[in-house]
């Protein structure tokens, strides 16, 4: 039987991995961790990474889910050399191989009715036998080929399947445990396990990195590969991810979709760094650049145990990357959140200017965007607790004096604003807090903000002066 390559298989490429999601939902963090592991392993060996969309489940697969998977992969910057390939576009190839297998006695048509199979199962269960097909149709060829039927793979009945899992070590399954797998349904469509085998063969996949929920599929797929005379990839089955409570990660734990983390304000660098550390590490190192991940990652060092998802650790990493990445880079992602929160940034400081100022307090870009609103928009009122404390009648004098000094400035710089604040405190013989706190509330509407000399510089001269005047009038109106 001959391979049918989809792209030139470079003999110099020693490692070719793939990520093969089913488009029945969004790209979740478990899938993203698997994709990352597969991608890193390929990159470590200067290999190739293939993206394949396993959309044979026609009832559950949707174009929306496919688009979401591609969007998630692109957001994480997990670029692929080949693909995306769609299984639904390769049905002719799968059926060609199945027909050849029938001709060579590697597969056979099964005409058994649902009733017969149901009765067989009940009989086997009553006899405390493992339910499996009894090969009735292998011995009976008296049916016309156009009668309704499925096609079954003729699984070996003797011996066992042995493979060395890169994560879990040696695994052995007796062939007596395996059934004659259906590889083509009655409607003529090939089944998942068969399509995967042909794809891995045609795409020259050398290493299959996937979730532990696929372990049971592996011996079945290996037997089909052997029957085809195809090379057997190395398999690596990574463990599942649990929530903070030790239970399997699900929607009740919050975000599980990759793009939900984008929406919640996380940088892709933070999520990638966090995912690579789930079940793998390099000493005590917590922060990894992408180049370091590629250099150091080893699939053989991934833990067999389930990993617990820790949102606090992800937030810590996110804040680190918000502070340490170039502001111009972070600004590209922050712009999405500004738009999402309907903050018009056309009149105000550049996003690159506010990121270093606000990232000390915000853990996510979503929080940072919300905290930046006063740089770009007027606010309707003042924080009640802060106003009760800092907008008493005696606050009018320092605000008025500060307004006078700021109005006189010819240089609207951080240093000049800071000097004006100091001079106001000195002139009135009061502490800096008596100047700074009313000033902060007047300009930001809040009792918390970065240093006011920096804040006022970014808010701008006209807005700052107008807001101080508005605050003075507000205090006087309350008296």
Curated annotation (Swiss-Prot):
Keyword set, alphabetical order: Aminoacyl-tRNA synthetase, ATP-binding, Cytoplasm, Ligase, Nucleotide-binding, Protein biosynthesis
A cellular component term, taken from the record's GO annotations: cytosol
Protein name: Glutamate--tRNA ligase
Family: Belongs to the class-I aminoacyl-tRNA synthetase family. Glutamate--tRNA ligase type 1 subfamily.
One Pfam family linked to the record: Anticodon_2
Disulfide bond entries: none
Residues that, per the record, bind ATP: 251
Origin species: Actinobacillus pleuropneumoniae serotype 5b (strain L20)
GO molecular function terms listed in the Swiss-Prot or TrEMBL record: ATP binding; glutamate-tRNA ligase activity; tRNA binding; zinc ion binding
Placement of sequence motif 'KMSKS' region: 248-252
InterPro entries in alphabetical order: aa-tRNA-synth_I_cd-bd, aa-tRNA-synth_I_codon-bd_sub2, aa-tRNA-synth_I_CS, aa_tRNA-synth_I_cd-bd_sf, Glu-tRNA-ligase_bac/mito, Glu/Gln-tRNA-synth, Glu/Gln-tRNA-synth_Ib_cat-dom, GluQ/Sye
Main location: cytoplasm
Ranges spanned by the short sequence motif 'HIGH' region, renumbered to the chain: 21-31
Catalytic reactions on record: tRNA(Glu) + L-glutamate + ATP = L-glutamyl-tRNA(Glu) + AMP + diphosphate
One biological process term in Gene Ontology: glutamyl-tRNA aminoacylation
Keyword Transcription: no
Subcellular locations according to the entry: Cytoplasm
Gene: gltX
Task of the protein: Catalyzes the attachment of glutamate to tRNA(Glu) in a two-step reaction: glutamate is first activated by ATP to form Glu-AMP and then transferred to the acceptor end of tRNA(Glu).
EC number annotated for this UniProt entry: 6.1.1.17
NCBIfam families: gltX_bact
Subunit relationships: Monomer.
